[in-house]
Amino acid sequence: KMDFTPAARECGLPLPRGWILVGVPGAGKTYFAKICAQKLGFPLVNIGIDVVKSGGVAKFKQLLSRIDACAPNLPYLDEFDKFFADEHGKELLGILLTWLNEKTSSTFVLATLNRLENLPPELTRAGRFDRVFYVDFPGSDERKQILQLHCARFDKRYAESEHGALSIEEWLTIIEATNKYTGAELAQMAIDQEQAENSQIG
């Protein structure tokens, strides 16, 4: 957030442009965007592919102008690679590149996609976005933390102790079985387990 301050401008630092997040569906890119907006104290402006495609080139220009006018904010461009996949793709790309290079508003763009190779290479060159991050599958410790967090919604034991209602051996079995699960899949796993237990009680 310090990079948006007048002090940063006085030091000659450029305004941050934004980041690209690459990862499989369900890896937590949307959650990351929400947390980033929260940390910056900026409202999140969700710009989906439907919004861009339905309005066309002229509406996209208007949208970027509104984003500038409503700054500070965090524009969130989901399924970013699909923005440039049709006959208007080159025009949209040119408009966005110009805006990124010339913008003077306190906006921080987060663009997400599943595969970086689907993105026009112009967008990953220096001076476009500040960073490209890969959001990978959660590791073993992270999987346990995610499961414990979601299980605690249904059973307070998971919030009150290190292992909740399970033994260490049971946790090890679950962690091994959930290798390459996304955060979304782990959340659904906790919900499915709770529903199964409730159906047995009923």
Place the predicted regions along the sequence by residue.
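Walker A/P-loop NTP-binding motif of AAA+ ATPase domains
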Residues: 1-172
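Conserved AAA+ ATPase small/helical "lid" subdomain
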Residues: 133, 157-202
